[in-house]
Amino acid sequence: MKYIEVDEELYRHIASKTEHIGESASDILRRILGLQVESVVQDAPEEISHPSLERVSPKPVKVAKVITKMTSTAVSDFTSLIDADVLAAQKGAVGRFLFILDTVHRASPVQFEQVLQIQGRDRLYFATSKDALLKASKSANPKEIGQSGFWVTTNNNTAKKRTILSEVLLQFGTDEAQVTDIIEKI
């Protein structure tokens, strides 16, 4: 496996051509270029540079804590549980993605463990620890979903976040119309 750097516009174009969760960049490029999609033996790199993992001291961020009493019974109508004002106040797509996942967790904490089944072909999206996601992918950029104890990888583009959230909502029995409405809020 070789690693290359691409500019943002090219990255977005390639990512927009994703057809299913877990599809690799190589598979997407092979499809775009009309090459045969086949299994290729991938050599592991000796060392990978991860500039995105280098940390600069973060500025303190004020976090508004929203506490809503939820029941532990199964919930499939999440649209009414999402506070539009609080959602709009979230920072970027990652903030909105995490907020909606936290809302799902608070609505059905007992059933939330089923999100651990959502995985890509070679990709882990959810785990119960930051280390598990980092072990699966050094560039996962894991974030905790509220105070749930569940972690999600956040280094995906917005389209992939929507696909992941769609899978989560469908597992909870949310109807297609609501899923579409909710994922568009990211």
From Swiss-Prot:
UniProt keyword terms in alphabetical order: Cytoplasm, DNA replication inhibitor, DNA-binding
Role summary: Negative regulator of replication initiation, which contributes to regulation of DNA replication and ensures that replication initiation occurs exactly once per chromosome per cell cycle. Binds to pairs of hemimethylated GATC sequences in the oriC region, thus preventing assembly of replication proteins and re-initiation at newly replicated origins. Repression is relieved when the region becomes fully methylated.
Gene3D superfamilies: Met repressor-like, Replication modulator SeqA, C-terminal DNA-binding domain
Residue ranges the record marks as coiled coil: none
Keyword Cytoplasm attached: yes
One GO MF term: DNA binding
Lineage summary: Bacteria, Pseudomonadati, Pseudomonadota, Gammaproteobacteria, Alteromonadales
Region of interest (Interaction with DNA), ranges: 93-94
One GO cellular component term noted in the UniProt record for this chain: cytoplasm
Organism, scientific name: Shewanella halifaxensis (strain HAW-EB4)
Protein family: Belongs to the SeqA family.
Name of the protein this chain belongs to: Negative modulator of initiation of replication
